[in-house]
């Protein structure tokens, strides 16, 4: 009986270890065009004092998605910023323009972003990514530095 339990625990650890190395695909649909960031670098950080969650998905140097949201009963997306190479960029900080859904640990946010400088029309977008785990943000040091007033 003990060997069976040990084998089950070791098997679970092995599967979890392998899964952690598999890339996470963050999908982006921007103005109807699909893009994907394949990365193992999706960092999901819980902010202190009810500040919500920040999701950061980074691919190559010019591929980035950052989502800030809160959840009190329902998900409210506070801010979304994205860059996919140089042709797909945008930022929105208006929760009225963005919706968010969470199923298990997969987040989907969609909405519209204002035009960038030199553009005339708003952009539509949909982003989907998965948080494999969550970390707590390091709180700011409240002890003043030596010599500080």
Enumerate the predicted regions with their spans.
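N-terminal export and membrane-targeting signals
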Residues: 1-10
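C-terminal motif of bacterial Sec signal peptides marking the signal peptidase cleavage site
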Residues: 14-17
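An ectodomain-focused feature that recognizes extracytoplasmic/extracellular
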Residues: 19-103
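N-terminal low-complexity, Pro/Thr-rich disordered segments
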Residues: 29, 135-149
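Short, low-complexity, polar/charged sequence segments that are solvent-exposed and flexible
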Residues: 46-47, 74-75, 127-130, 146-148
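Extracytosolic low-complexity repeat regions of secreted or lipid-anchored proteins
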Residues: 83-134, 140
């Amino acid at each position: 009986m003990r060997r069976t339990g040990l084998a089950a625990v070791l098997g679970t650890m092995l599967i979890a270890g392998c899964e952690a190395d598999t890339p996470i695909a963050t999908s982006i649909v921007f103005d109807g065009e699909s893009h994907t960031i394949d990365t193992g670098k999706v960092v999901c950080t819980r902010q202190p004092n009810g500040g919500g969650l920040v999701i950061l998905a980074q691919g190559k140097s010019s591929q980035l998605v950052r989502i800030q949201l809160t959840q009190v009963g329902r998900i409210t997306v506070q801010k979304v910023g994205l860059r996919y190479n140089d042709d797909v960029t945008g930022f929105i900080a208006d929760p009225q323009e963005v919706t968010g859904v969470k199923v298990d640990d997969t987040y989907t946010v969609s909405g519209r972003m204002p035009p960038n400088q030199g553009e005339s029309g708003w952009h539509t977008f949909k982003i989907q990514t998965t948080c494999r785990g969550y970390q707590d943000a390091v709180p700011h040091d409240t002890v003043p530095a030596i010599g500080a007033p």
